[in-house]
Amino acid sequence: MAAAEVADTQLMLGVGLIEKDTNGEVLWVWCYPSTTATLRNLLLRKCCLTDENKLLHPFVFGQYRRTWFYITTIEVPDSSILKKVTHFSIVLTAKDFNPEKYAAFTRILCRMYLKHGSPVKMMESYIAVLTKGICQSEENGSFLSKDFDARKAYLAGSIKDIVSQFGMETVILHTALMLKKRIVVYHPKIEAVQEFTRTLPALVWHRQDWTILHSYVHLNADELEALQMCTGYVAGFVDLEVSNRPDLYDVFVNLAESEITIAPLAKEAMAMGKLHKEMGQLIVQSAEDPEKSESHVIQDIALKTREIFTNLAPFSEVSADGEKRVLNLEALKQKRFPPATENFLYHLAAAEQMLKI
């Protein structure tokens, strides 16, 4: 087996099953291998079967302390052999961000459970994918891990949609991401939150870092503590109460109202100037061009972003220990950039850990 395939198959961490019975009780029925009580409680909370509003969310995903979770939920048809179950959720935990891959695999596992009514077949398929990267079954469809490239998952969102909603204000999101600030996104529908938040890391494509994404967070003490341990993040919420938690964000996006708010404490670092205006115009121009694909828009933004780092390069020098490049603040000040540009470059150097300690 190719080394890349071996690496790919080692990404899954576990599989679990949650059921809602005819009495309306929701139970954690089975998992492989075992899981912690904390993670089990988190997954029960994320699974829509425990939700009081009784809305069915076919697929949700998110991250908790570097573990990604993917949950597919279905209603059990009357014809199924699962007579005492009205709904069930299949949960997969993994080390990687790839919603399309795990949505496809959980759908196959759902079909297996509907047909056999026992987790045994699911476990066999899970182990097959874990060890070989493939599971094949005539009636339930086959799944091949390597069909789902991580890069494809990174490109699956739509920057064009974000720009059509926020226009020039998209540059606020770009600036916040460049400076590794904390972005909180609210919308009452989890699907809208997930679609929007998963796209944001693509605005800073040079980092290709989706570990900053926490697309489904509850206002739960343990989850918030885990979130606040991260330096910068993109966090999605469906509870408007999060707007009253300024300790959680530098930038607040109310998707439902199409509003972006910069928190008072972040205003100094996020002050906008000529550089930001140019960046905003480029983002809007590129995204509104019907000839350009999503990946082309990302490329345009990445090239302009590289220019910003090129601006920073002349003011950096090798640190005393020779380990990394650090900012020469005097050289930056002597250049006499407009205040907003100098301020941004300084904060960018801080975000890139280029300040002298």
UniProtKB/Swiss-Prot annotation:
Q: What is the effect of changing residue 127 to E?
A: Impairs interaction with CCDC93
Q: Name one GO cellular component term.
A: late endosome
Q: Which stretch is the leader sequence?
A: none
Please name one Pfam family that this protein belongs to: SPA
Q: Does the keyword Oxidoreductase apply?
A: no
Domain dDENN: from-to ranges: 301-357
Q: Which residues form the cDENN domain?
A: 165-299
uDENN domain residues are 1-140
Any idea what job this protein has? Guanine nucleotide exchange factor (GEF) regulating homeostasis of late endocytic pathway, including endosomal positioning, maturation and secretion, possibly through activating Rab proteins such as RAB27A and RAB27B. Promotes the exchange of GDP to GTP, converting inactive GDP-bound RAB27A and RAB27B into their active GTP-bound form.
What family is it from?
A: Belongs to the DENND10 family.
What is the name listed in the Swiss-Prot or TrEMBL entry for this protein? DENN domain-containing protein 10
Originating gene: DENND10
